[in-house]
Amino acid sequence: MAKNQWRPYTNGSHAPSTPRHLLSIADLTPTEFATLVRNASSYKKTIKSDSMPERLTGALSGKTVAMMFSKRSTRTRVSTEGAVVKMGGHPMFLGKDDIQLGVNESLYDTSVVISSMVSCIVARVGPHSDIANLAKHSSVPVINALCDTFHPLQAIADFLTIHESFASQSATHGTHPSSLGLEGLKIAWVGDANNVLFDLAIAATKMGVNVAVATPRGYEIPSHIVELIQKAREGVQSPGNLTQTTVPEVAVKDADVIVTDTWISMGQETEKIKRLEAFKDFKVTSELAKRGGAKENWKFMHCLPRHPEEVSDEVFYSERSLVFPEAENRLWAAISALEAFVVNKGKIA
């Protein structure tokens, strides 16, 4: 039988329905994204009060979640394993020494075999094509825990963090299922345009949050990602706007939140000297925020790991910094996503 004619075996006469995957925030409607954030917030409050929501108790009992990580990880691994265990499931970690995607066997073979033995695949990979191919041939939900292009779990955690700090200040908070009460907020991204930014900007557009991006010339958001961000405006009553500049001070003007990330991602080590030179004027400092005219109560975020050239100690360890709650929120984001895509089979409510 030709490979493209293969169908998963079932005890019946027909193949199972195609599972729903989470590969990018672009896969979600505004209401679905807002619901994932709200659920994460609710579960965080309940579980940290030494209680477990009834809908999560044993929700993954008897289920195995395969964690296929071809890239090293700290927060993603700990948050995902912790989420699975809290929900009563079994996390199975498959690192790069256990499995090499597309090396010893095709991605097709890997996806078909592993998905026949587990209830979900959480994958942290390199090229987006790897996660897309895993999902294409998987018989169970695939959740993107990071690829070179997107990082949806980080975006959920980031908006949970922003929601906790700013939503109560908005008069529109909680008035519509597709709203997080953040309309009109401004995020300034200062640094490299990367996978974290891409999903953050898509989410912001859906939530009515404006994003101003400052990168050195030559490090801007790729045109095909800009198109995807603009597409996220469709069907949104008051979508957020995206602007780009090469001047950090321009980006941070009137910013509520200033965000940065590593300047040298995994796989870019050979570009270190070039990148350090290109980004030398993009360090987040109190002086930068003051020169640019950020709002008086601006907050700082960074998904970690952090390097001293990216942000000053003064900002990173200040009361403005949300980096440690942001990191913790990866756990609650993972719980929310696992419930939606594994327990509820893609129905987000």
Swiss-Prot record:
Name by which UniProt lists this protein: Ornithine carbamoyltransferase, mitochondrial
Keywords: Amino-acid biosynthesis, Arginine biosynthesis, Mitochondrion, Transferase, Transit peptide
EC number: 2.1.3.3
SUPFAM superfamilies reported for this sequence: Aspartate/ornithine carbamoyltransferase (SSF53671)
One annotated Gene Ontology cellular component of this protein: mitochondrial matrix
Quaternary organization: Homotrimer.
Binding site for L-ornithine: N195, D261, S265, M266
Binding site for carbamoyl phosphate: S73, T74, R75, T76, R124, H151, Q154, C303, L304, R330
Principal location: mitochondrion
Catalytic center residues: C303 (proton acceptor)
A UniProt-annotated Pfam family: OTCace_N
GO terms (BP aspect): arginine biosynthetic process via ornithine; citrulline biosynthetic process; L-arginine biosynthetic process
Pathway connected to this protein: Amino-acid biosynthesis; L-arginine biosynthesis; L-arginine from L-ornithine and carbamoyl phosphate: step 1/3
Catalysed reactions, as listed in the record: carbamoyl phosphate + L-ornithine = L-citrulline + phosphate + H(+)
A single MF term (Gene Ontology): ornithine carbamoyltransferase activity
The family this protein is said to belong to: Belongs to the aspartate/ornithine carbamoyltransferase superfamily. OTCase family.
Subcellular location: Mitochondrion matrix
